[in-house]
């Protein structure tokens, strides 16, 4: 682990994600320099806190930093099945570079976060969703998963849960939490999160041991918006947290979409406002979403085959794909012929399955019937729009 990564681990434990003063300081000087300054108690030379509140914040962060051992935190996380992904790591999603700052991500699950987010959509909405909202969330998410999209949401009751469950029926999903990944919140979704971890991932900016706090959910929402090229708001009341996610999507220049609902439903007031103000595009089916988030010429018709170009896979995942045959091969053999690491291979296979590049069979894994090796790397460019 590099000093820079170790410092970022520490920062997740002592400072709030995306802080408007500390964040730019980390971007400018590097996490290792800022972490060393926190341990010393003195701000970096020439970079004094800009206000009395910032001075108090610095003192609090400095006191907490002296009580944090990044290496022990990494060990405790590994015991809980949680890994740390820093900017620049192979699993780091490139879209997060557009955030003003993100110290790093804690990740749990067999999926590969970067690969899952290559072709993805965020689906959000009310916790107290109506039957209409639950139906639409499930229908959209299932159809998006059928078309090789990963569904990203916040793991809450209501629309989030419906979206995650539907995506799992044919693909993978990403859960973004506002607490440490050793905590299942809400508790009623512990089983759902276990299912997600088998093929997808759970993600958080907070380390293990951190319990959920109300302000953290709004901070978490910016990550949901940032991970994907587009966000769909299925249902949202006048003060719904989903509208906060929508604002982040707009700020990040992502595609914002909203589903219209009954004019008499208070759970659709927020969606109708987004549409009335021209902030969101109206979507009534998954095909509408695909047309808006996928560049012209890349939206292959349903059933045309894998929709993640092989050229966009990281090197390790590409090696795993090359070890899978048409007749089928066992997981251990794939690992032996590719990465040499069984855990990494299982994670890569889960991602490849979600992308439609491999499928399960009696022998283990095989290439789908429709796969055409010579065209994979060019499918996105040659598919009809």
Residue ranges and their predicted role:
Residues 1-91, 274, 355-371, 375-385:
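Short, small/acidic-rich helices and loops at N termini and domain boundaries
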């Amino acid at each position: 682990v590099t000093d820079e990564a170790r410092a970022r681990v520490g920062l997740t434990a002592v400072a709030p994600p995306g802080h408007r003063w500390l964040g730019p300081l980390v971007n400018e000087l590097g996490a290792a320099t800022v972490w060393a300054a926190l341990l010393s108690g003195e701000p970096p030379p020439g970079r004094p806190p800009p206000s009395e509140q910032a001075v108090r914040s610095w003192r609090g962060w400095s006191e907490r930093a002296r009580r944090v051992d990044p290496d022990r935190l990494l060990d405790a996380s590994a015991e809980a099945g949680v890994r740390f992904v820093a900017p620049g790591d192979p699993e780091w999603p490139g879209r997060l570079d557009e955030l003003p700052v993100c110290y790093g991500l804690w990740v749990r699950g067999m999926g590969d976060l970067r690969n899952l987010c290559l072709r993805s959509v965020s689906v959000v909405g009310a916790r107290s969703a109506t039957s209409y909202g639950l139906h639409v969330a499930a229908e959209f998410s299932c159809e998006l998963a059928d078309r090789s999209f990963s569904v990203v949401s916040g793991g809450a009751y209501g629309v989030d849960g419906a979206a995650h469950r539907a995506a799992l029926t044919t693909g993978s999903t990403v859960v973004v939490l506002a607490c440490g990944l050793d905590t299942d919140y809400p508790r009623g979704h512990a089983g759902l999160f276990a299912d997600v971890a088998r093929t997808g991932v759970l993600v958080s900016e907070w380390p293990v041991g951190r319990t959920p706090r109300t302000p953290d959910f709004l901070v978490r929402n910016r990550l949901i918006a940032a991970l994907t090229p587009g966000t769909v708001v299925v249902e949202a009341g006048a003060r719904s947290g989903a509208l906060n996610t929508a604002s982040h999507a707009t700020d990040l220049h992502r595609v914002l979409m909203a589903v219209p609902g009954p004019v008499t439903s208070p759970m659709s007031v927020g969606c109708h406002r987004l549409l009335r103000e021209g902030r969101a595009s109206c979507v009534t089916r998954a095909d509408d979403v695909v047309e808006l988030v996928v560049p012209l010429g890349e939206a292959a018709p349903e059933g045309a085959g894998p929709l993640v170009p092989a050229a966009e896979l990281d090197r390790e995942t590409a090696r795993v794909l090359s070890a899978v045959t048409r007749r089928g091969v066992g997981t251990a053999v794939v690992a032996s012929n590719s990465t040499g690491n069984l855990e990494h291979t299982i994670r890569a296979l889960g991602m490849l399955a979600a992308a439609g590049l491999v499928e399960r069979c009696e022998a283990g894994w095989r290439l789908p019937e429709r796969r055409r090796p010579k065209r994979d790397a060019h499918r996105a460019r040659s598919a009809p729009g």
